[in-house]
């Protein structure tokens, strides 16, 4: 980006404009995490590199430059800035044994990939944002919003997030150290080293440590209190080796390690001060790519993901110790059939074993075999048609075909319009099928059973997802994107109370989701940029008695921000407004809700580059000191079950050797 002087009048204009837009019912927006350019290449939408203007999908990209400029603490913070993506945090790391849930377009059925390798758990089908690779190891993040089942399979109903990590062979030799400290005894440390040897072996290694004490939150009376038992301690190591073989072939080995433990304060009936959680993740993969710089590229990879989680409690009925282990193999080949026609095909197999005596009465297994193909046909100079088909054979539910059709029209070099339809198929998880656990509780001196039950008679979820969108470059300094989506799912799986008082998985008749995303990104000059965004999502389910709201998670999100950058200094301001949350809504037999209908947060960041190798930074979060929650749920007194942190700060530095 070029450099010129910050104009005070321009800054004031943006602030006033942001306030006007957020006061209405609709805002146009885009986060600075993605600047739309027609020449940008992405891989997640089609499993191979394609020009974004020829990609009929709603896809966002976070670059390593954006990660560095914003000094994100982790990948969860980075992806939470993307319109259409929600990361549901709890303030502590102890919700549901440490899971910060990721949603796309209001849907939690999201597939998470690391360098194209699936990492979702077989037990829950999810993957916590807390477990993603550290930001110092990330080259870029691609987010596909909309169904990806035809290419990626059963978990990709709401979308796909692909974390692409750095390769040592593509880096200059370096060592980078980072340290930060902040509120609630926060300490963050990271070190990365990478480069290539004389014989071309690429080496990249990163190590990180993140720990924090008990955090503070604002309660229902407006008082700031400390959440007991909410501290955590996390260590991680990532290693990636890659070696080019010949001109266009490459072999890559990768290892990811994560060890985390902390308090779990969020009990169903109140705050707990003794429950703890621990988790160990060890993932290993090997991949061979051939003809990687050609139109006839392909690869084969084998992998093993190992997760060991423990929930520790003085209450023996509330303990849990489980292992979730998946091994798999992927094979993919692309073909250039003609100048206007490309085909990609592949096979995939994975097997998951889950062992938990408390939750599943021992070991459970599922496996899935699949073959897929997609044809990309430019049938005219400005038209492209993508047609795809996937065949899955699930060990429990047999065979299923999932087609996808996408149409892209390039109106000119600065604008494209796309329409995409996909059939989705989502098999129940091990947790949905086999969970069986009793957690007795005491109320007024009387003990009651509290069962959580899976349902082996569940049907798979099936349905359709539609996306219509456009990307356009209004001017040399202004980019605009817009999209709408709609999904209808039959036999959607929901957890709710049954007639015997147990919490159980059921198929509901129908589920509908609809929403929109509007975004604008403007560059006032070569130093100053701004963005505005609005996203809307609504989820409804019909149990045979009419549609009712379901989840009601952040139905309206307004975001705005500005960024100033010159050779030495970077300043960021991010505004976030959520409204439309329901204080009380029903989900089958159960009631949920939020302590507040709306909230407003403000984050500020500053970075100063001391020299070419060193920088210092400071960030402030929730400077409005708002009371808010991202997971729904209230206690009987109206207090939020999962309050998010109050105002906090972090200060750090980074040095390159």
Regions found by a protein language model. Give the residues of each.
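Periplasmic-side early beta-strands and strand-to-turn transitions of outer-membrane beta-barrels
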Residues: 150, 162, 170-172, 178-180, ...
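Conserved C-terminal beta-signal and adjacent last beta-strands/turns
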Residues: 7-9, 28-29, 194-196, 206, ...
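Extracytoplasmic beta-strand/coil segments of soluble accessory domains associated
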Residues: 76, 80-117
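A beta-strand signature from Gram-negative outer-membrane beta-barrel systems
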Residues: 135-176
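N-terminal Sec signal peptide and the immediately downstream disordered periplasmic leader
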Residues: 1-72, 76-82, 194-195, 235, ...
């Amino acid at each position: 980006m070029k450099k010129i002087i910050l104009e005070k009048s321009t800054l004031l204009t943006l602030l006033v404009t942001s306030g006007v837009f957020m006061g209405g019912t609709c805002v146009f927006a885009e986060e600075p995490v993605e600047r739309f350019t027609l020449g940008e290449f992405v891989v997640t939408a089609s499993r191979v590199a394609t020009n974004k203007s020829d990609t009929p999908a709603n896809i966002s990209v976070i670059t390593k430059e954006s990660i560095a400029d914003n000094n994100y603490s982790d990948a969860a913070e980075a992806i939470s800035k993307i319109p259409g993506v929600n990361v549901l945090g709890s303030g502590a790391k102890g919700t549901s044994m440490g899971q910060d849930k990721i949603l796309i377009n209001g849907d939690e059925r999201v597939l998470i990939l690391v360098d194209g390798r699936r990492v979702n758990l077989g037990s829950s089908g999810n993957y916590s944002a807390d477990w993603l690779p550290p930001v110092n190891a990330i080259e870029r993040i691609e987010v596909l919003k909309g169904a990806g089942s035809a290419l990626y399979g059963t978990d990709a109903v709401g979308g796909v997030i692909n974390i692409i990590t750095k390769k040592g062979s593509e880096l200059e030799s370096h060592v980078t150290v980072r340290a930060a400290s902040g509120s609630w005894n926060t300490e963050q440390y990271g070190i990365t080293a990478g480069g290539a040897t004389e014989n071309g072996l690429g080496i990249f290694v990163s190590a990180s440590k993140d720990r924090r004490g008990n955090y503070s939150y604002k309660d229902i009376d407006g008082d700031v209190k400390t959440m007991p038992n909410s501290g955590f301690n996390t260590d991680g190591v990532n290693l990636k080796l890659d070696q080019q073989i010949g001109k266009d072939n490459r072999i890559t080995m990768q290892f990811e390690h994560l060890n985390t433990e902390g308090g779990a304060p969020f009990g169903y009936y109140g705050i707990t001060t003794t429950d703890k959680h621990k988790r160990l993740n060890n993932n290993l993969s090997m991949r061979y790519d051939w003809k990687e710089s050609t139109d006839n590229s392909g690869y084969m990879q084998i992998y093993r993901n190992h997760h060991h989680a423990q929930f520790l409690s003085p209450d023996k009925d509330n303990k849990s110790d489980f292992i979730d282990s998946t091994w798999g193999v992927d094979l993919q080949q692309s073909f250039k059939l003609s100048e206007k026609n490309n085909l990609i095909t592949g096979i995939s197999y994975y097997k998951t074993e889950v062992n938990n005596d408390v939750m599943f009465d021992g070991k459970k297994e599922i496996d899935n075999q699949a073959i897929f193909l997609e044809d990309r046909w430019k049938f005219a100079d400005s038209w492209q048609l993508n047609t795809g088909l996937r065949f899955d054979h699930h060990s429990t539910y047999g065979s299923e075909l999932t087609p996808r059709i996408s149409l892209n029209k390039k109106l000119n070099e600065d604008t494209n319009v796309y329409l995409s339809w996909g059939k989705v198929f989502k098999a129940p998880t091990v947790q949905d099928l086999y969970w069986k656990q009793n957690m007795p509780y005491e109320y007024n001196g009387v003990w009651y059973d509290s069962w959580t039950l899976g349902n082996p008679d569940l049907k798979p979820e099936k349905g359709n997802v539609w996306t219509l969108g456009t990307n356009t470059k209004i001017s040399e300094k202004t980019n605009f994107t817009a999209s709408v989506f709609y999904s209808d799912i039959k036999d959607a799986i929901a957890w709710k109370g049954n007639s015997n008082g147990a919490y159980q998985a059921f198929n509901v008749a129908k589920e509908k989701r609809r929403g929109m995303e509007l975004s604008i990104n403007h560059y006032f000059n070569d130093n100053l940029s701004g963005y505005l965004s609005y996203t809307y999502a609504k989820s409804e389910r019909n149990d045979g008695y009419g549609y009712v709201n379901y989840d009601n998670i952040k139905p309206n999100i307004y975001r705005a921000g500005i960024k100033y950058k010159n050779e030495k200094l970077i300043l960021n301001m991010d505004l976030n407004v959520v409204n439309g949350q329901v204080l009380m809504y029903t989900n089958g037999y159960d009631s949920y809700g939020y302590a507040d209908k709306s909230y407003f947060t403000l984050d500020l960041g500053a970075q100063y580059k001391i020299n070419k190798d060193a920088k210092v930074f400071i960030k402030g979060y929730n400077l409005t000191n708002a009371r808010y929650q991202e997971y729904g749920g209230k206690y009987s007194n109206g207090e939020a079950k999962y309050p998010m942190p109050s105002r906090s700060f972090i200060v750090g530095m980074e040095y390159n050797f």
